[in-house]
Amino acid sequence: MRTRSLIVPIVLISLAVPLSAQMSRVALVRQSDIIFAGTVTRAGVVRVDQVFEKPDAVSLMKGDSVAVVAARAGSPPLNPGMQATFYTTGWIYGRWITVREVGHEPIGPQLATVAGTGTAQQDLVAGARQQVNDADLKARIQTAAMVVVGRVEQIRPPAYTGAPARPKRFTEHDPNWQEAIIHVDEGLKGATAGERVVVRFPGSRDVAFVGTPKFAAGQEGTFLLRKDSATGSPLALMAGQTVQAYTALHRLDVLSKQDAPHVRTLMRTP
């Protein structure tokens, strides 16, 4: 049975300046990983009314109390009864959770009402996060050499055409490079249907490669590929031919097959 205290003190290093005086909601969301709506109950204390975003490892729920500490002497106080959305980043975790406030956005009566999918403010935060995610994905698409929808036919050891340009260094963080042979079902950028592409990825489970996409035979998806500049040997062998090798090392480079329509839409958007 999980035991939790009724009061979770969280220190906010607060700018105590409303959103309009700082930056756009999208900019606030981009810099934040803990976002919640709350009501000031007394000087320096906020009751959490709704949690919009937080890391899975952070325990923060409706009804928890948050201690708000101003970052600068003379900052405007948060008055009792004030409702706001707080955009913050986690800092210190222990008996007290300490977060830095990026900014806060006062919630007026028009935003406190319940919308069809939750509070109106929740919808605004979710919309801003979607804009952030789309902007990040579009940037990855624009810099990719190839964008394809396809299926991994096989995984094999790397077939280098020559010795890597950089001597191999043997460390505990050896990437253990592997190659995925991907059959292109649909080429969205830089490829045509029916092609086969060599994609290199670190097979190592070392902490240095946590979050780096891994491939498996039979895997289907939408892949954003870049010419291999990581292994020191950018060319590979396939069916007796020398071909360009690619990588997909960012979490946004490997998406589901169902994400292909959204990728197409972003590619058409100016």
For each of these PLM feature ranges, what is it?
Residues 7-18:
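Bacterial N-terminal signal peptides
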